[in-house]
Amino acid sequence: MTRRLKIIALGGVLMLSVMSCEDQHVALPAQGHWRVVNYWAVWCSPCREEIPELNRLHQETDLVVFAVNYDGKQGEELASQAATMNIGFRVLAQDPGPALGVERPRVLPTTLLVDPAGRVTDTLVGPQTQETLLAIWRTRAGD
């Protein structure tokens, strides 16, 4: 599978388009929306504990949550691993980190909070809860 990454600027807002595991372009971030980007792997026990929290965050809030497989799995293998982890939000087939100016995480899970302008405001290492992510987001968003 060819990795495709598009970076364009519209009105001063960074628009990063990456491929999802469904082979669709996904804009990260969409103007006006905060994004949560989570790095995970099937062998990561804390990731398994964290995914239900991220599923709740995705279902119960306006934050848009994305999953990035740390091992770089693609296609059917990526979809299978995401299903094994019960990920209920969009799974990206490529790492948006380089375009966001973020190095590959050294510890899993790692979660990025990305503001509507495409800037990473926080890099959170270790498992997060819906409550901790909401508290950080509210502080950054000024709620």
Q: Could you tell me what each predicted segment is?
A:
Residues 1-9:
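Bacterial N-terminal signal peptides that target proteins for export
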Residues 49, 59-95:
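Conserved segment of the thioredoxin-like fold in thiol-based oxidoreductases
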Residues 21-35, 99-102:
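A short beta-strand-turn-helix
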Residues 33-35, 39-43, 107:
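Short pre-active-site segment immediately N-terminal to redox-active cysteine/selenocysteine motifs
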Residues 36-37, 65, 111:
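Hydrophobic beta-strand anchors of alpha/beta hydrolase catalytic cores
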Residues 39-56:
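Conserved redox-active cysteine motifs that mediate thiol-disulfide chemistry
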Residues 8-17:
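Bacterial N-terminal signal peptides
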Residues 83-88, 94-138:
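Thiol/disulfide oxidoreductase modules built on the thioredoxin-like
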